[in-house]
Curated annotation (Swiss-Prot):
InterPro entries: Cyt_P450 (IPR001128), Cyt_P450_CS (IPR017972), Cyt_P450_E_grp-I (IPR002401), Cyt_P450_sf (IPR036396), Cytochrome_P450_monoxygenase (IPR050121)
Gene Ontology terms describing biological process: terpenoid biosynthetic process
Provenance organism: Neocamarosporium betae
Main function: Cytochrome P450 monooxygenase; part of the gene cluster that mediates the biosynthesis of betaestacins. The bifunctional terpene synthase btcA converts isopentenyl diphosphate (IPP) and dimethylallyl diphosphate (DMAPP) into the sesterterpene betaestacin I. The C-terminal prenyltransferase (PT) domain of btcA catalyzes formation of GFPP, whereas the N-terminal terpene cyclase (TC) domain catalyzes the cyclization of GFPP into betaestacin I. The cytochrome P450 monooxygenase btcB is then responsible for the six-step oxidation of betaestacin I to yield betaestacin II.
Pathway assigned in UniProt: Secondary metabolite biosynthesis; terpenoid biosynthesis
One GO cellular component term: membrane
Protein name: Cytochrome P450 monooxygenase btcC
Annotated positions binding heme: 446
UniProt keyword list: Heme, Iron, Membrane, Metal-binding, Monooxygenase, Oxidoreductase, Transmembrane, Transmembrane helix
Entry's family note: Belongs to the cytochrome P450 family.
Gene name of this polypeptide: btcC
One Pfam family from the record: p450
Length: 510
């Protein structure tokens, strides 16, 4: 090693040691428990984040350190419903204390902030308010017809597969279903992936780049020099930038087509137009289109991935628990005699179906990590947290916790039933249902929650009415086989759907 190199190492090592000692002993978070290496460097978090087992790591840390865990030099994880309420409901621009979204996590490299990535509470409210009208009860009634038609396309495709005794990958069809619904609801034009039985380029781009997005989160946590170096290396080894550009290009094309030929049917794009800030329009409307493509991309992504994850995991869990599937068959097949009776309003009466959905959201939350916020200096769950600390409260640490749910690791829809239901079970009366918050809380709560519930109720009711289901292969806890790469990566879920004879199901008993 050259003399300058020796000088650099000799000088740099004490600096690193000094930083480590400071973070362990004198940092404002030094009193909070957690892995020592996590307190010293973000690299500990990045390693756990990228190995696909982050959710299981958090569960182990909670058992070891309790309900408040230091997972990075300046970051805490909380594991109580009270902390979740404190973190996620205080982000209103009218409040003195605001927990804003952590910019490095949500930051995007191009375009305008979206409903998902906007960190400023006032700007977020400006974006969200016009869009809320697009998710009103009257709008959802219009979207219901879209959901019904796409669900009918899906049952037709599954019936074709059954004629050849072919099992299908539920994950693939769930993604097509939710993608077709959200693209038509957004643009007023069908993508047709279900009817055609194959993915579009847009859907492939959307679902094929999850792991790279997780890497992006890890890179953005690094110091500037390291971040620049890693981005340079990653850009050469990965197609991420190219895929992202292709994805936005498709979004832009859809926006251009929508502007040229507005549909008569109700659609979210009308409300997206109302959110557009004043932008300088050049010859080709570039700034205007960049804004629109970003908002559309956020809506389509948000309405596809997590919704399809829930649908896939729900079907998987029902097949792993035949007694609960039998109860759902009993409810649906005695409520409807034909598929045309199934719509948004009629499915609201299916209490067991709703319980199945809520239990699926609990035992396998579509978002498997905590949404990071920046603390303004406030009490969280009875603990004072210094200003500038990044905080989060992952659902995963509460929904599978025996303090909040009886038999937390078991799939038991009965816990969500009202007392007057024939399958109600008193053992679940002490469950703290508020500990499950799959759509988050407060002003940042998922804007598409009602649409998602409508999709799940309608498509599941049609699938249960039309088919008997049989899984191919063994089943196990999805948490053990899935990998968390920002979103969930699950192995193929192969299912055989066989048309039923048309008789109402007999009572499965108590």
């Amino acid at each position: 090693m050259s003399f300058p190199g020796v000088i650099f190492v000799v000088s740099f090592f004490p600096l690193l040691m000094g930083i480590a000692v400071y973070r362990l002993l004198w940092h404002p978070l030094a009193s909070f428990k957690g892995p020592k290496l996590a307190a010293v460097t973000d690299w500990w978090f990045c390693k756990k984040w990228l190995n696909g087992r982050y959710h299981q790591t958090l569960e182990k840390l909670q058992l070891q350190y309790g309900d408040v865990i230091r997972i990075a030099p300046n970051e805490l994880v909380f594991a109580t419903p009270e902390a979740a309420r404190d973190i996620y409901t205080r982000c209103n621009p009218d409040q003195d204390l605001q927990f804003i979204k952590q910019p490095p996590f949500y930051k995007q490299s191009e375009g305008f902030p979206t409903l998902v990535t906007e960190t400023d509470p006032a700007a977020h409210r400006t974006l969200r308010k016009p869009l809320e009208r697009g998710f009103s009860p009257s709008s959802l009634k219009d979207y219901g017809r879209v959901i019904e038609r796409v669900a009918d396309d899906l049952t037709a495709q599954l019936e074709k597969a059954s004629e050849h005794s072919n099992a299908v990958d539920v994950k693939a069809w769930a993604a097509r279903f939710t993608f077709d619904v959200i693209t038509e609801v957004t643009f007023g034009k069908s993508s047709g992936t279900v009817a055609q039985g194959k993915n579009t380029v847009w859907l492939d781009l959307l679902t094929g780049n999850i792991a790279a997005a997780a890497v992006g989160v890890a890179i953005r946590r690094q110091p500037h020099a390291v971040k620049t170096l890693l981005r340079s290396i990653f850009a050469k080894l990965s197609k991420t930038a190219k895929l992202r550009a292709q994805y936005l290009s498709v979004c832009r094309k859809m926006c251009e087509e929508r502007l040229r030929d507005p549909p008569k049917a109700a659609n979210l794009f009308d409300h997206v137009l109302a959110t557009c800030p004043p932008v300088e329009k050049d010859a080709d409307n570039h700034g205007y289109l960049v804004f629109l493509q970003g908002q559309a991309a956020a809506l389509v992504s948000g309405g596809t991935e997590t919704s399809s994850t829930l649908l896939s995991s729900l079907i998987y869990n029902l097949l792993a628990h035949p007694a609960h599937l039998a109860r759902l068959q009993y409810e649906v097949r005695n409520a409807f005699s034909q598929s045309g009776e199934i719509d948004i309003e009629s499915t609201k009466q299916l209490k067991y179906l709703q319980a199945v959905i809520d239990e699926s959201l609990r035992i396998f939350p579509p978002v498997g990590f905590g949404l990071p916020r920046v603390c303004p200096g406030a009490m969280i769950g009875g603990v004072y947290v210094p200003k500038g600390t990044v905080v989060q409260a992952p659902d995963i640490l509460m929904v599978r916790n025996s303090r909040y749910f009886v038999r937390p690791y078991e799939f038991l829809p009965e816990r969500w039933l009202p007392k007057d239901h024939e399958f109600y079970d008193e053992q679940f009366s002490g469950d703290r249902k508020e500990a499950s918050k799959p759509f988050s809380l407060g002003p940042r709560q998922c804007i598409g929650m009602s649409l998602a519930y409508a999709e799940w109720r309608i498509v599941l009711a049609k699938l249960v009415l039309k088919f008997d289901w049989e899984i191919i292969g063994e089943t196990q806890d999805l948490m053990d086989v899935a990998r968390l790469k920002l979103l969930w990566e699950m192995p193929p879920i192969l299912v055989s759907f066989k048309p039923v004879g048309g008789l109402a199901a007999a009572s499965p008993g108590a």
